[in-house]
Amino acid sequence: MLTQRQKKILQAIVRQYTSTGQPVGSKHLAEKLPFKVSSATVRNEMAVLEDNDLILKEHSSSGRIPSKRGYRYYVDNLLDPQAVTDNDLVVIQNSLGNGFQKIDEIISHSADILSNLTSYTAFTLKPEQESVRLSGFRVVPLGNHKVIAILVTDSGEVENQSFTLPPDIDTDAMQAVIRMINDQLVGLPLSEVVKRLKDDIPLQVLHYMHSPDGFLDIFDNVLSQAARERFFVGGRLNLLDFASTHDPHAIQSLYGLLDKNDNLSNILDSTLTSDNGVNVKIGQEISKNKLLDDYSLITASYNVEQYGRGIIAVLGPTRMPYSRTIGIVNAFRQELAKRLLDFYRHYYDS
C-alpha cells in the first residue's frame, strides 16, 4: 500500500516522463511537486517505488522511468483525464460534419481524424451489425458462366462480387433459388440469415438443384462481406515511430499486424463491458505478440442507440500522455456517436 506522498511522487514521475521522454531525477522532481520536500526524501520514496517494481532505473541515467506495473497503477489509481481543449473539440466537430454518403466513409475518416489528433495509430469499427437486415439479393449474368452477385441491406450497404458459376448449374434453377432466398430471408437480421444458410436453406435448395454447394457458396461469400466486422486504420506509419527495434523483419511484422481483420479483432477487445466504455491495456495485456510490449492501447465504445455499438481505439507508446489521450478519445466517441445517429435518422426518415 502506497502512502499519499508516494502516490503523488509516482504520479509526477509518470506525467514528467510521458511529457519529456527523459528519466526523472529526485532533485528535479522535488522542485516540481505540489508540496515542499527535500530531494533526499524524494530519493528515499523513489527507492520504495522501485522496490515495488513501479519505477525503473535506466543504465544511462541516474533518473527513473515508470515500469509497466507503474503505468498500470497510475492508470488505475492516479489518472485524472484531461478535458479536451476547445480547439480539439472544434476540429473533431468540423471533421465529422462533412457531407458523407455512407457509414463506412464516416468510420474510415474517423480513424484518420483520431490519428491526427493524437499522432498515434487509430482504429475504428463501425456499429455492430445486429440490427442490419437483408433487403435483397440478386445475381446478374455476365456471360461465359460469369455472374455478379449483389446483396443489399436496409442500412443502404451494397455488397457485390464477381463469380464463375460451375458449368452444371442451370440458370432457371438458379433464378428459382434466388426467388426463394428473397421470399424467405429478406427482412431478417444478417445474423439470422447466416444461421438459416447453415440450417434449412440448403435442404430447400435441393428442390431445385442436385447440390446446394456451388450456388450457396456465392451467397455465403457475399453475405460474409456484408456481415463482417469492418476495422479502419489511420496513421499506420505512426506505429513505427515508437518501435523499440530497428530490425527490418520485426518492423515488417509489426506493420503487418494492421493488415488483417483477425489480428485487429484479437487486439481490439470487441466485448467492452465497462460502464464508461473506456479501457486501457498496457504491454502484454494487449496481445501475446511481443512486438506490442512497449505499446499501450486505449479502447472506447460508442453507442448509437438502437443502431448498435462501435469501437474506437488508439495504439501508442507506453509513455503516451494518458490524461490527454483518454480525454480526446472520450470526446471523440461522443461526437462520433452523435454524427452517426444523425446519419442513421436521416437515412431511415428519408
UniProtKB/Swiss-Prot annotation:
| Gene transcribed to yield this protein | hrcA
Protein family = Belongs to the HrcA family.
Matching entries from InterPro entries are given as: GAF-like_dom_sf (IPR029016), HrcA (IPR002571), HrcA_C (IPR021153), WH-like_DNA-bd_sf (IPR036388), WH_DNA-bd_sf (IPR036390), WHTH_HrcA_DNA-bd (IPR005104), WHTH_transcript_rep_HrcA_IDD (IPR023120)
Q: Which PANTHER family match?
A: HEAT-INDUCIBLE TRANSCRIPTION REPRESSOR HRCA
Listed under GO biological process in this entry are: negative regulation of DNA-templated transcription
Q: Name one GO molecular function term.
A: DNA binding
Give the organism, scientific name.
Limosilactobacillus reuteri (strain DSM 20016) (Lactobacillus reuteri)
The superkingdom listed in its UniProt entry is Bacteria
Protein known as: Heat-inducible transcription repressor HrcA
Pfam families for this protein: HrcA, HrcA_DNA-bdg
Function summary: Negative regulator of class I heat shock genes (grpE-dnaK-dnaJ and groELS operons). Prevents heat-shock induction of these operons.
The record's listing under SUPFAM superfamilies reads: GAF domain-like, Winged helix' DNA-binding domain
Instruction: Please verify whether the record's keywords include Repressor.
Output: yes
Name the UniProt key words of this record, in alphabetical order: Repressor, Stress response, Transcription, Transcription regulation
